[in-house]
Amino acid sequence: MAQILVLYYSVGGSVQRMAELIAEGVERVPGAAAKLRTVPIVAPATQTAAPAVPPEGAPYAELKDLEACAGLALGSPGYFGNMAAPLKHLFDGTVPLWQKGALAGKPACVFTATGSLHGGQETTLLSMMLPLLHHGMVIVGTPYTQPELSATRAGGTPYGPSHFAGVADDQPVTDAERALCIAQGKRLAGMALKLRG
């Protein structure tokens, strides 16, 4: 069974919903299974640390989750065109995996949600790709053969699924965005199975 890690950070719930849809797509591929994980908030040393286990939702990711996965879907809200600090913090701690090439050759995709339509979706997606490329992962984009990519009037890019959440994070995922997330999960899982041989 090819285990696909769907790793995300979500504040208002939009990125979490996208992660669940990508996981749904993964689960539609025979021989693949999705594993949902999140990361704790990053707090200054003067603030209280996050609990070791989240009170609800997906468990926190550990390095062993990354090492064991056959593929990775990485999701973050966009903050000034970049991935959120908690995900960056996690990847800053992956040097031991990088040193032994634990992620090299594995497929990965990225997804995001932003509060404004031009809120840096594509640069956020690109910022998430950088550590994945350093790890030697194979980036799996969203091709224009996916018809919703050409038809969407909200989120969706060839770099990966995206969602326009609104400033209050109150915009639901559109039908086109939903279809793109599910298709991305299926594409990632299929690629993981092909690369495993």
Can you say where each PLM-predicted feature lies in the sequence?
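N-terminal beta1-alpha1-beta2 submodule of the flavodoxin-like/Rossmannoid cofactor-binding fold
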Residues: 1-102, 164-197
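Glycine-rich phosphate-binding loop at the start of an alpha helix
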Residues: 126, 156-158, 175
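Alpha-helix boundary/capping detector
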Residues: 92-95, 99, 113-116, 134, ...
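Gly/Ser/Thr-rich helix-start
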Residues: 13-14, 72, 76, 82, ...
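Short, glycine-/small-residue-rich phosphate/pyrophosphate-handling segment
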Residues: 104-154
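Mobile beta-alpha loop/short-helix "lid" or hinge segments that flank ligand
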Residues: 39-44, 136-168
